[in-house]
Structure formats: C-alpha cells, structure tokens
Amino acid sequence: MPLLQPCNFQRPKYLFNGHLETIFPTLFRQVILPPTQQDLVETHDGDVLEVDWHRRGHPKLAIISHGLEGNSSRSYMLGMAKEALSKGFDVLAWNYRGCGEQLNRKAIFYHSGATYDLETIVRYAAPGYTEIALVGFSL
C-alpha cells in the first residue's frame, strides 16, 4: 500500500475554525456533474441499495461512502466524485439503507459496523475494473 505524503493544506483566513470549515461548503458549495446512471442493488436479505454511477470508461473505480445521515447527492460526495473522475477513476457513490430515495424493504437500517452492505457493493461493482479504491466519510 502506498504511503501518504504530508499535506501542506492551510485553510483560508475567513474559515478560522473547524466548524466554519464544515458549515461553509454545506451552504455555499455547488458541484456540477453530468447526470448519473442510477441502479438498485439487491442485498443478501432482500433489501435494496441505491447507487449512482459516474462512468467515463476508466479501468479504476472509486467507491464512495457517505457520512452520517448523508447521501450520494450531498456536495461533499459530488466534490469527491469530481476529483476522482479527474484522477482517472470511474465513480460509484452509494446510499446506505434508508438514506436514499427508496424506502427500505426490511426493518434493518444502516449502522457503521455493518460491512456486509459495502461487501455487496464491492462485489456488484468490481467486474471490469483493475483497481478499486474505497473512500469514506466520517460516521
């Protein structure tokens, strides 16, 4: 696994604390991407997961998982998708159970310890890709 290099990030002076860094893009950031291909993925227990594909024919895939009470259409998800596309990845952004537009079929909602849905997504998306990167936001 490659090692990450130190980051020289310095926030703008007007975003002088972490709270503002979180709130500002939520209110003012707009990310424009072409329309996605939306699919429904059946789970092992008969529920359904919603996925948004951003396909450009790249050999690599980034699977992006949203944060607590987020979804695949949030600006931070779209921003990450845009960045991954620019780095040569196709993108699959998925919604945890109960976080998309579809109602759950089962009485099971998501929780951070339930990795079986992520495994379902990886198995669904993997064919045809030479490399898969998992990207996740804080729960």
For every predicted segment, state its role:
Residues 50, 76-79, 117-121:
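Well-ordered alpha-helical segments embedded in enzymatic catalytic cores
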Residues 59-67:
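Short beta-strand element of the alpha/beta-hydrolase
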Residues 67-72, 91:
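Serine-hydrolase catalytic-loop signature spanning alpha/beta hydrolases and amidase-signature enzymes
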Residues 70-82:
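The serine-hydrolase catalytic nucleophile loop
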Residues 1-53:
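An N-terminal hydrophobic leader/cap segment in hydrolases
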Residues 66, 136-138:
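Conserved alpha/beta-hydrolase "nucleophile elbow" surrounding the catalytic nucleophile
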Residues 83, 97-133:
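Catalytic nucleophile-loop/oxyanion-hole region of alpha/beta-hydrolase
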Residues 61, 85-95:
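A fold-wide structural signal in alpha/beta-hydrolase
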